[in-house]
Regions:
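A conserved helix-loop-strand patch within extracytoplasmic ligand-binding domains
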Residues: 98-149, 247
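Short helix-initiation/N-cap motifs at beta->coil->alpha
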Residues: 56-66, 155-183
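Alpha-to-beta junction loops
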Residues: 69-79, 125, 148, 169-171, ...
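Ligand-binding "clamshell"
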Residues: 86-98, 111-115, 187, 192, ...
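Pocket-flanking alpha-helical
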Residues: 61-92, 114, 198-202
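Short, well-ordered beta-strand elements
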Residues: 23-33, 51-57, 126-127
Length: 262
């Protein structure tokens, strides 16, 4: 009898270990804020669905895509489709969107030491903007949307400062990495900042901006995967990130600075 009980216990433990090890592991690269925070909120939901999520945080826009292409990541979460498409074209990568999760509206922020409103921006003001193709275009689009400059009508989604057709206030543009714009703000008059980088820098993204980009051009941030990778666990990842639980987490945590696509 004792041997039978021991055998039964052994089989039960073996079965339990088998169940635990049956969970699929997903390694996802992400920017710290809000992407990694949103993934952390999704972790327990994914675990219930048999997926163990490992999050690797990056502080740049290049390595997450290179490591995904190389197979070191299963997916990444930090970018919008225009950036992804431009990256593919520039680097020969083969990455696609598996689904959209949220928007990060861009805002025009003022150097904290200066009292500047949208109507009182001085002529010759220095404005820091992101230097990557798609975010620079978005930043310039924000300035045009708010009547500060005019762009060449043929510039499209790849506009740079060279495509500024009218700059009546003679603004001086400083192009830096998107993540560096908040740190540059103290050295310029204004900066156009992605809300995720504003959040990381501790900037008040709800009350501080004096202008926002048009909601019609705010690009959704996506889960990127390798072309042809249609594993069910990746579909589940997207489904969870678009679920009511995560939508509520985003709304309650970021108060409009990050907006769910659903």
């Amino acid at each position: 009898m004792k041997k039978l009980l021991t055998l039964a216990l052994s089989l039960a433990l073996t079965a339990a270990v088998g169940v635990a090890s049956a969970n699929t592991k997903l390694v996802v690269g992400a920017s710290a804020t809000p992407h990694a925070e949103i993934l952390e909120a999704a972790k327990p939901i994914l675990a219930e669905k048999g997926i163990d999520l490992e999050i690797i945080v990056f502080d740049d826009y290049v390595q997450p895509n290179l490591q995904l292409e190389a197979g070191d990541l299963d997916a990444n979460y930090f970018q919008h489709i225009p950036y992804l498409e431009d990256f593919n074209a520039q680097n020969g990568t083969h990455l696609v969107s598996a689904g959209a999760v949220h928007y990060e509206p861009m805002g025009l922020y003022v150097n904290p030491a200066k009292a500047i409103t949208l109507d009182s921006i001085p002529d010759g003001a220095t404005i820091a903007i992101p230097n990557d193709t798609t975010n620079e275009s978005r930043a310039l689009g924000l300035l045009e949307f708010n009547g500060l400059i005019k762009l060449d009508t043929e510039a499209g989604q790849t506009a740079t400062v060279l495509d500024i057709a009218e700059n009546p206030h003679k603004f001086d543009f400083v192009e830096v990495e998107a993540a560096q714009v908040p740190r540059t703000l103290a050295d310029v008059d204004l900066g156009v900042i992605n809300s995720n980088y504003a959040l990381q820098a501790g900037v008040d993204v709800v009350g501080t901006p004096i202008a926002y980009e048009s909601t019609e051009v705010a690009y959704p941030n996506i889960i990127a995967v390798r072309e042809g990778d249609d594993r069910e666990e990746l579909k589940t990842l997207v489904e969870v990130l678009q679920s009511d639980e995560i939508v509520n987490f985003i709304n309650e945590t970021y108060k409009g600075a990050v907006v769910p696509t659903k």
